[in-house]
Amino acid sequence: MRFAYGRLPWRRGAVLGSALLVLVTAPAASTATERSGPAPARSVILLIGDGMGDAEITAARNYSVGAAGRLAMDTLDASGRRTTYAVDERGRPVYVTDSAAGATAWATGRRTVNGRVSKSHDTDRPMPTLLELARDRGYATGSVTTASVADATPAALTAHVTDRSCKGPADMAACPADTRAGGGEGSIAEQTVAARPDVLLGGGADHFAQTVTDGPFRGRTVTQQARAAGYQVVRDRTQLAAARPGRPVLGLFAPEYVPVEWTGPPAAPGGTAPQRCATRNPGRPAGTPDLAESTRAALDLLTARAHHRGAPGRGFFLQVEGASIDDRAHEADPCGQLGETLAFDRAVAAALDHAERHPRTLVIVTADHGHATQILPHDARPAGLSATLVTDEGGVMQLGYGTALPGETQEHTGVPVPVAARGPLADRVRGVQDNTSLFGTVTAALGLR
């Protein structure tokens, strides 16, 4: 069955704040069964709306399906809140997290320093990730993003570096101990290939085009390293559709971030005239798959890959990130932000459709952190940047961005983010939880610990 979303009557479930985790699961199990019997879940799909807090979701809902409507991500059954904070090197709270520390929290179950990727806050040592644990237990694994596949959120599953900027072999200035010459495992791109997820889809071609400087692939690009490891390297939707599950797939659809879907005037001092967003970006190449397409492709490839492996009860672990919600909010670009939020919601719908066809499925939705967006009275005169939009239902909505001076990058916020779930173990997300709690939910669902 396919879900019909839009102006729906209220269903059990909460307004989500940011990311969606779909777990393919079995009937709820007791704690003893989780420890000693079959895992409650066969597969997990974790979808992350980067920077997609309550205001970002509400703005997208208002603009598209209306204030009384419901997005796909609004339809999950159990809901709660997650804290979002990092720590410093001494373990003291840092109340606003970045995406690296935020992703490390759910990927490893431990907090770390802002900018650090799946390494400890005090000793700077690698910490095992959900993807690594799932892979080592025989699950197929994958990561889909609209950022570079070497960006902070996907990197938290596949790499361990001191600083998130160390994406390719030429980017290692902030990570001397992580270089191969320094005794480390190399850049995020190199480590990601070495981690060997079955599916990697997103941007980041420029990072993979860099030349490896040390180790067995010295003098070759990271893309060549991937091909040597058996990866099918695809560059557009046609090549993605032709990929086969017998070998791992690396999709590089853009030099860095995948171009956004919508465009429009940015927020400005004193506001803008009421406007509509342009729902087609002329700067987006025609062959670029959208996030829902990439999600469906990854689900099909991983399902087939898991079946081919034949491990009893083992499906897959997949993370899907809508990265440019955060990127566009940083730039006070309301139309870009709304378009990416709605593109993410279509990926959520694709995941829910998959889960409906594969009944051992649990869905969890959350975010890494909040962002700068505020929904203001249409006649307000805010001190910061603002833009006024005319929604699909004919309303007037003013969005404000006031966490930085005009011309500077808007900031994350330290608020809790919504989390919601559907399926067995969904009740684990209820209440107010720590931002490391998803690690425990996923490991329990897949029987990883």
UniProtKB/Swiss-Prot annotation:
It comes from Streptomyces griseus. Specifically cleaves both streptomycin-6-phosphate and, more slowly, streptomycin-3''-phosphate during the biosynthesis of streptomycin. Binds 1 Mg(2+) ion. Zn(2+) 2 binds at residues 50, 368-369. SMART domains: alkPPc. Gene3D superfamilies: Alkaline Phosphatase, subunit A. It catalyses: streptomycin 6-phosphate + H2O = streptomycin + phosphate. This is Streptomycin-6-phosphate phosphatase. The gene is strK. Pathway: Antibiotic biosynthesis; streptomycin biosynthesis. Zn(2+) 1 binds at residues 326, 330, 412. GO terms for biological process: streptomycin biosynthetic process. GO terms for cellular component: extracellular region. Its EC number is 3.1.3.39. Residues 268-290 are annotated as: Disordered. Mg(2+) binds at residues 50, 151, 153, 321. Keywords: Antibiotic biosynthesis, Hydrolase, Magnesium, Metal-binding, Phosphoprotein, Secreted, Signal, Streptomycin biosynthesis, Zinc. The keyword Zinc applies. Residues 1-32 form the signal peptide. Belongs to the alkaline phosphatase family.
